[in-house]
Amino acid sequence: MIVEMSQISKSFSGNQVLKNVSFTLEKGEIHALMGENGAGKSTLMKILTGIYPRDEGVVRVKGKEVAYTHPKDAEKDGIAVIHQELNILPELSVAENLFLGNEYTVGKTGWLKTKKMNEYAEQQLAELGLKVKASDRAGALSVGKQQLIEIAKALMTNADIIIMDEPTAALTDREIDTLFTVIRGLQEKGVTFVYISHRMEEIFSLCQRITVLRDGNYVSTKVIAETSFDEIVKLMVGRELGGRYPDHDLEPGAVKLAVKNVSRKNEFESVTFEVREGEIFGIAGLMGAGRSEVVESIFGYRHLHSGTIEIDQKPVVFKRPVDAIENGIAFVPEDRKTKGLIVNFSVRDNLSITNLATVSSGNMMSSTKEQALYQELVKKLGVRTSGPHQKAKSLSGGNQQKVVIAKWLGMKPKVLILDEPTRGVDVGAKKEIYTIMNELAKQGVAIIMVSSELPEIIGMSTRVAVMFEGKLMKVLDRNELSEETIMHYATGGDKHVHQ
């Protein structure tokens, strides 16, 4: 074993987050680490990499017992971490990012050997199949290319154990394929990977073993070839979840929202579709297809350059989000932490912000009404909090997303737009969010769901609009849905608009 962690325990302020957890890595394997948010995955890896000291237990790396006190100690033993939020300095060049802290200099003068650094950087990146100029500004590259730069940086420190945290969360399908090719190529050279992800399909196609944690406890380690999706889900949540998606028994009614020939220069062109009350209308497409731009324009985040929007067959103009809100449209954005929540505010305050009329008496906010709204919405959506004053930033990803959805339900929306509703959310919370969406649709809410996960699009949608390069290629009925059909149109198949 290249890594052995035995009986690891860790507490913070009396709260035990790891309880006698064991974890092993075989040389040259890709080992998935899974568990719901809050299961202890990140804490365990932070102990391995020297960010946190362990309270109890033993860590052995390459046969020797270690007690790292700093990430640099782990780096010396060949351990590197590639975080979900990449450590790229966008204004520096590609080479400067690769050599940061280890620059080639002329003696002790501090002058950089820029040419030598650039040549070596391009050589290292070429070995990963990435052809970029080392002098290019790193921030101008796609997230997928930035991720390969992070891998190259790890290899330049002679890392042979690489920990990857949600590496594909912001990548296109093509970038994911490239990343997997690189990972498999490095595996053949003996590099070992810990792969942390909620995406079950990726784990089953890439990894050899999987370790599951639950509530800070070690649950099981399985050989991928000898287990199943359902078994892993049960290990993660401690119960049978049933089907991944709710039974599809929705009965759409009258047209609630009509989008007619809407365009925005350089983003999308002549997009037309209708959404009925009581349906979940999916919008699929590859990254850059214009999906988020369309729904943000419907909500008034972006100004339309042409086209019309109708609510209940009446034309409306949204110059800003408040106009959309006043017309009964709610929006759960792709980035919940910057656009959906005020993370330093309490859960109760976040719920009150969009429901000021409900929680006010005259011109003053009523603490009693705020508490009543908090209790109603938290119960309705099953938000797990320590209390109304818990900061939103300390919630798990799934509970943060439930708060973002909950804050809109007080206004009883006619239309609910969800952009990547389960991104970064564990499998148990996904199931709960799907159930919430289904119940809202049954109550007559017209739901628009943008998602990059094709199983989610197919499992949840009544109909699906597929976009490619700013154009709506096709609206598919539920009985037409398949991954192959969606990808056909998402990659430009039949390059003309279908309705």
Curated annotation (Swiss-Prot):
Domain ABC transporter: residue ranges: 3-240, 250-494
UniProt keyword annotation of Translocase present: yes
EC number from the UniProt entry: 7.5.2.7
Recorded coiled-coil stretches: none
Domain of life: Bacteria
CC terms in the record's Gene Ontology section: plasma membrane
Main localisation: membrane
GO terms, molecular function: ABC-type D-ribose transporter activity; ATP binding; ATP hydrolysis activity
Top-rank EC class of the record's enzyme: translocase
Entry keywords, A to Z: ATP-binding, Cell membrane, Membrane, Nucleotide-binding, Repeat, Sugar transport, Translocase, Transport
Catalysed reaction equations from the record: D-ribose(out) + ATP + H2O = D-ribose(in) + ADP + phosphate + H(+)
Cross-referenced InterPro entries: AAA+_ATPase, ABC_carbohydrate_import_ATPase, ABC_transporter-like_ATP-bd, ABC_transporter-like_CS, P-loop_NTPase
Membrane topology field: Peripheral membrane protein
The protein's assembly and partners: The complex is composed of an ATP-binding protein (RbsA), two transmembrane proteins (RbsC) and a solute-binding protein (RbsB).
UniProt protein name: Ribose import ATP-binding protein RbsA
The species this protein was found in: Shouchella clausii (strain KSM-K16)
